[in-house]
Amino acid sequence: MKTKYSHYNNQLQLAHQGKTVFLKGFIFRKRNLGKTLFFDLRDVSGIVQLLVKENNPQYDKIALIKLETVVQIKGQVIERINKNPDLPTGDIEILVSHIEILSEAQTLPLNVFQSQESLEETRLKYRYLDLRNPEVKHFLIQRHHITQSIRQTLLKNDFLELETLILSKSTPEGARDYLVPSRIYPGNFYALPQSPQLFKQLYMIAGFERYFQVARCFRDEDLRSDRQPEFSQIDIETSFLNQDEIMSLTEEIIVDLFANIWKKPLSQPFLRLTYQQAFELYGSDKPDLRNPLKITDFTTFFDTTTCPQNMFSGNIKGFKVSKTAVLTRRKLDEYQLFFSKHFNLKLFSFVKKNDKIIGGISQFIKDDSFLKNEEICFVVSGTKDIMHKALGIFRTKLALDLSLVDTTQEALLWIVDFPLFETTQEDLPQPDLTLENSNTSNRLYSLHHPFTAPCDIAILKSNPQKALAKTYDLVWNGYEVGGGSLRINNPQTQELIFSLLGFSQEEVQTRFGFLVEALKYGTPPHGGLALGLDRLVMLFTKTNNIKDVIAFPKTQSAKDLMLEAPSAVDQEQLNTLKLKFKCNCN
């Protein structure tokens, strides 16, 4: 029988009626109606129905074919009597004249047609079978289309697709490194890159001006539903473009994606909020603007002079909502417990009915004009940063409980003017501290990374804790899908940043000596960003789990169930690397 395809399944239409075709694929479903067999043949393009009549000399053999067996068939395209409008090939079927089994399948550990209903452990262990499900396969096909759209936008803007190293050097970039021991240099280690940050800056110093790549990144950090230990990002760096120009280029990428993937228009420019505005309005630096709730300052409506001492400590802020019917007493108690347990704040709630405020603190409200009948108001008071953070989390919870998020909309915005430093950071690599500088209470940490350019050098020198950074994060429906900054192109400024972060001269030379030296030989103004490819695909495919859009993801505990990795290695391999294994696992 002819061994080449004549068509992919989804290419076949009524226009092919009467033609002989040669197809290959998996037997997806089958139905035996006594004198007629129906099969669904699945290939990468889609599904087509096969018809086998009783007079076919292979009828008895074909009737015994197991699901997921790989076959090639010869047949004639005929018009389907009972058409299926849900299939691209629903107007036709293939009258099979010959079938050849290429690989017979044994009984499968999961139902490919309904693999999404299987346990996640089973799906991940047999991921290659899970990926046969057309809905699951669609995620990765969309990933391809999204990647290609981004690539085409960058290529038309004169970017070069260049690679960077995988075996790199351990540098503090915000998480723990995955280390690779060197056989040739015992006791020394490579690190898998957390990002190509330093390499892409070196590309700019080398004069390439516009770089991008689909980069693999590795971070040994705690996992979440939208995070994996290895992930992909669209990594971009440019010379001579300012912040507005880089943000505009990024918007062009997203606008093209909406047009190519969803066939939807998207207006520019995107909304911009400063980091401070985002926290004051939404209690988050990645707010979901489909949620209509905004933090409101209600202080002026209260008579705080008559309140008990310590009832309010600062401004009184919160939300008001109109969906009071679904808020039970139990739910209100749950909200109060959330604030007291996690933030040591007291939540007050009150409602307006028949033009009268009802609630425990109604006596302290001097002006109730801010509240309409049947509206409920939630307020707290406390330290600004803690209060805003608490209200931000509560905002998300309240919107979920009351179904306030408009899921028919897409909300994109930029967050800009981040602080350059933060003063607390847990579980991250730290510089060595000398005895003279051993007090960690006022330690500074880079909010993004130590190569970010400050907005104002004078403030950086006089009051570094107040310094802002030339950074910009792209937020979509509450997810950070990209972020970047302008970089430092002055060696003195870079050394000042390292000093403020507590790195000694020896540490700087050991970890970043190559960069500091490179900055001395003429460095163009440059900046860039990275778009999280996995998160973009997750949002474009409307799934809530990032594992769905990664071909071979790991579990929440960073295990690969299919490969059974990580795994032990034999003693000979350790001896070759001159390593001795010591574990205090309890």
From Swiss-Prot:
<comment type="subunit">
    <text>Homodimer.</text>
</comment>
<keyword id="KW-0436">Ligase</keyword>
<dbReference type="InterPro" id="IPR004364">
    <property type="entry name" value="Aa-tRNA-synt_II"/>
</dbReference>
<keyword id="KW-0067">ATP-binding</keyword>
<dbReference type="InterPro" id="IPR047089">
    <property type="entry name" value="Asp-tRNA-ligase_1_N"/>
</dbReference>
<dbReference type="InterPro" id="IPR006195">
    <property type="entry name" value="aa-tRNA-synth_II"/>
</dbReference>
<feature type="binding site">
    <location>
        <position position="173"/>
    </location>
    <ligand>
        <name>L-aspartate</name>
    </ligand>
</feature>
<dbReference type="GO" id="GO:0004815">
    <property type="term" value="F:aspartate-tRNA ligase activity"/>
</dbReference>
<keyword id="KW-0963">Cytoplasm</keyword>
<dbReference type="InterPro" id="IPR002312">
    <property type="entry name" value="Asp/Asn-tRNA-synth_IIb"/>
</dbReference>
<feature type="binding site">
    <location>
        <position position="480"/>
    </location>
    <ligand>
        <name>ATP</name>
    </ligand>
</feature>
<dbReference type="GO" id="GO:0005524">
    <property type="term" value="F:ATP binding"/>
</dbReference>
<feature type="region of interest" description="Aspartate">
    <location>
        <begin position="197"/>
        <end position="200"/>
    </location>
</feature>
<dbReference type="GO" id="GO:0006422">
    <property type="term" value="P:aspartyl-tRNA aminoacylation"/>
</dbReference>
<keyword id="KW-0030">Aminoacyl-tRNA synthetase</keyword>
<dbReference type="Pfam" id="PF01336">
    <property type="entry name" value="tRNA_anti-codon"/>
</dbReference>
<keyword id="KW-0547">Nucleotide-binding</keyword>
<dbReference type="InterPro" id="IPR004365">
    <property type="entry name" value="NA-bd_OB_tRNA"/>
</dbReference>
<feature type="binding site">
    <location>
        <begin position="219"/>
        <end position="221"/>
    </location>
    <ligand>
        <name>ATP</name>
    </ligand>
</feature>
<dbReference type="InterPro" id="IPR004115">
    <property type="entry name" value="GAD-like_sf"/>
</dbReference>
<comment type="similarity">
    <text>Belongs to the class-II aminoacyl-tRNA synthetase family. Type 1 subfamily.</text>
</comment>
<feature type="binding site">
    <location>
        <begin position="532"/>
        <end position="535"/>
    </location>
    <ligand>
        <name>ATP</name>
    </ligand>
</feature>
<dbReference type="Pfam" id="PF00152">
    <property type="entry name" value="tRNA-synt_2"/>
</dbReference>
<keyword id="KW-0648">Protein biosynthesis</keyword>
<dbReference type="InterPro" id="IPR004524">
    <property type="entry name" value="Asp-tRNA-ligase_1"/>
</dbReference>
<dbReference type="GO" id="GO:0003676">
    <property type="term" value="F:nucleic acid binding"/>
</dbReference>
<protein>
    <recommendedName>
        <fullName>Aspartate--tRNA ligase</fullName>
        <ecNumber>6.1.1.12</ecNumber>
    </recommendedName>
</protein>
<dbReference type="GO" id="GO:0005737">
    <property type="term" value="C:cytoplasm"/>
</dbReference>
<feature type="binding site">
    <location>
        <position position="487"/>
    </location>
    <ligand>
        <name>L-aspartate</name>
    </ligand>
</feature>
<dbReference type="InterPro" id="IPR012340">
    <property type="entry name" value="NA-bd_OB-fold"/>
</dbReference>
<comment type="function">
    <text>Catalyzes the attachment of L-aspartate to tRNA(Asp) in a two-step reaction: L-aspartate is first activated by ATP to form Asp-AMP and then transferred to the acceptor end of tRNA(Asp).</text>
</comment>
<feature type="binding site">
    <location>
        <position position="228"/>
    </location>
    <ligand>
        <name>ATP</name>
    </ligand>
</feature>
<feature type="binding site">
    <location>
        <position position="219"/>
    </location>
    <ligand>
        <name>L-aspartate</name>
    </ligand>
</feature>
<feature type="binding site">
    <location>
        <position position="448"/>
    </location>
    <ligand>
        <name>L-aspartate</name>
    </ligand>
</feature>
<dbReference type="InterPro" id="IPR047090">
    <property type="entry name" value="AspRS_core"/>
</dbReference>
<dbReference type="InterPro" id="IPR045864">
    <property type="entry name" value="aa-tRNA-synth_II/BPL/LPL"/>
</dbReference>
